């Protein structure tokens, strides 16, 4: 089947609505919407929930941008895209909870198509979701990865292991020699066997995110915490900032294509701290995190 960008766009708009409704149901606070237009073509809807009952900040962004020529970040590893017009659309979200025992989560699903007259379109899907705990709970990690595995199974037994490994490899801070969190799923350049199959998988990932995340939020949101846990949470959020600004391809793509900076940087935590040569106390729950986030098979 020929790629249907309109069908993908409608799914993404509905997905943004659904996820915002689900997060509001857990938190009680409403999202504030900011619709924007991109001068060079396209626009989006940015939605932010701030200082809610559970979430310090949650941002759920839909964007649909198009242009006559590809940016350098995209053609660097896909030279065949040079000289083509393009459309890129997606939903991207990050949730930063108040409670340090509730992990931060990130999800993204996207579709890209590049066309020129007289040639077949070049298209692909990408996306995934990943979890960044501050305090490790095995049952949470197992639930997260089991949900990821189960949504992948209808698409093949090799899908989850392949995209789990890709996620582990991608969300890695080379300058720190550590993982950003416990991973999940990451896929990109997905265009085989056909459009319908790839679109169905992207939909499964988009819908699966809240199935994976919200039970963990419910389990941890009422746990008591103090200044020590909060300080550690803010310190570890620094890793999130470092990854997004130094390594993340999506951030670089957005900034290079003249995307909306406020929306691109919406993933940043509202508060964060750095501390020179910080070392957690031996045997403390904080010290245990470095071992917990090392790559392993959770299911």
Curated annotation (Swiss-Prot):
Keyword match Metal-binding: yes
Annotated spans, Important for dimerization: 240-275
Main location (coarse class): cytoplasm
Entry GO terms, CC: cytoplasm
InterPro entries reported in the protein's UniProt record: Coprogen_oxidase_aer (IPR001260), Coprogen_oxidase_aer_sf (IPR036406), Coprogen_oxidase_CS (IPR018375)
Keyword Electron transport in record: no
Residues involved in Mn(2+) binding: 96, 106, 145, 175
Cofactors that this protein relies on: Mn(2+)
Reactions catalysed: coproporphyrinogen III + O2 + 2 H(+) = protoporphyrinogen IX + 2 CO2 + 2 H2O
Pathway as given in its UniProt record: Porphyrin-containing compound metabolism; protoporphyrin-IX biosynthesis; protoporphyrinogen-IX from coproporphyrinogen-III (O2 route): step 1/1
Residues the record lists as binding substrate: 92, 108-110, 258-260
Site (described: Important for dimerization): 175
BP GO annotations: protoporphyrinogen IX biosynthetic process
Enzyme class: oxidoreductase
Disulfide bonds: none
Annotated GO MF terms: coproporphyrinogen oxidase activity; manganese ion binding; protein homodimerization activity
Key words of the record: Cytoplasm, Heme biosynthesis, Manganese, Metal-binding, Oxidoreductase, Porphyrin biosynthesis
EC number of the protein: 1.3.3.3
Pfam family, any one: Coprogen_oxidas
UniProt similarity note: Belongs to the aerobic coproporphyrinogen-III oxidase family.
UniProt function note: Involved in the heme biosynthesis. Catalyzes the aerobic oxidative decarboxylation of propionate groups of rings A and B of coproporphyrinogen-III to yield the vinyl groups in protoporphyrinogen-IX.
Self-association and partners: Homodimer.
HAMAP family according to UniProt: Coprogen_oxidas (MF_00333)
Protein name per its UniProtKB record: Oxygen-dependent coproporphyrinogen-III oxidase
Natural source organism: Escherichia coli O139:H28 (strain E24377A / ETEC)
Name of the gene this protein is made from: hemF
């Amino acid at each position: 089947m020929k790629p249907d960008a309109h069908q993908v766009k409608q799914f993404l708009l509905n997905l943004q609505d659904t996820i915002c409704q689900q997060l509001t149901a857990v938190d009680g606070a409403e999202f504030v919407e900011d619709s924007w237009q991109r001068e060079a073509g396209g626009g989006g809807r940015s939605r932010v929930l701030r200082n809610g009952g559970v979430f310090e900040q949650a941002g759920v962004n839909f964007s649909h941008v198009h242009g006559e020529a590809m940016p350098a970040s995209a053609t660097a590893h896909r030279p065949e895209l040079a000289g083509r017009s393009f459309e890129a659309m997606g939903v991207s979200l990050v949730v930063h909870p108040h409670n340090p025992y509730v992990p931060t989560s990130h999800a993204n699903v996207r579709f890209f198509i590049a066309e020129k007259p007289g040639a077949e379109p070049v298209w692909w899907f990408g996306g995934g979701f990943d979890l960044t705990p501050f305090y490790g709970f095995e049952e949470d990690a197992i639930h997260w990865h089991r949900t990821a595995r189960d949504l992948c199974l209808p698409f093949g037994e090799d899908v989850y292991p392949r995209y789990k490994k890709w996620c582990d490899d991608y969300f890695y801070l080379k300058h720190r020699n550590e993982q950003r969190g416990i991973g999940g799923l990451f896929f990109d350049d997905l265009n085989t066997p056909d459009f319908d199959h790839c679109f169905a998988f992207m939909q499964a990932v988009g819908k699966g995110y809240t199935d994976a995340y919200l039970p963990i939020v419910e389990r941890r949101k009422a746990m008591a915490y103090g200044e020590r846990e909060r300080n550690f949470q803010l310190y570890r959020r620094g890793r999130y900032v470092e990854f997004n600004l130094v390594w993340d391809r999506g951030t670089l793509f957005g900034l290079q294509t003249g995307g909306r900076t406020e929306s691109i940087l919406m993933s940043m935590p509202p508060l964060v701290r750095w501390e020179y040569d910080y070392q957690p106390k031996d045997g403390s729950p904080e010290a245990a995190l470095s071992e917990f986030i090392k790559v392993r098979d959770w299911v």
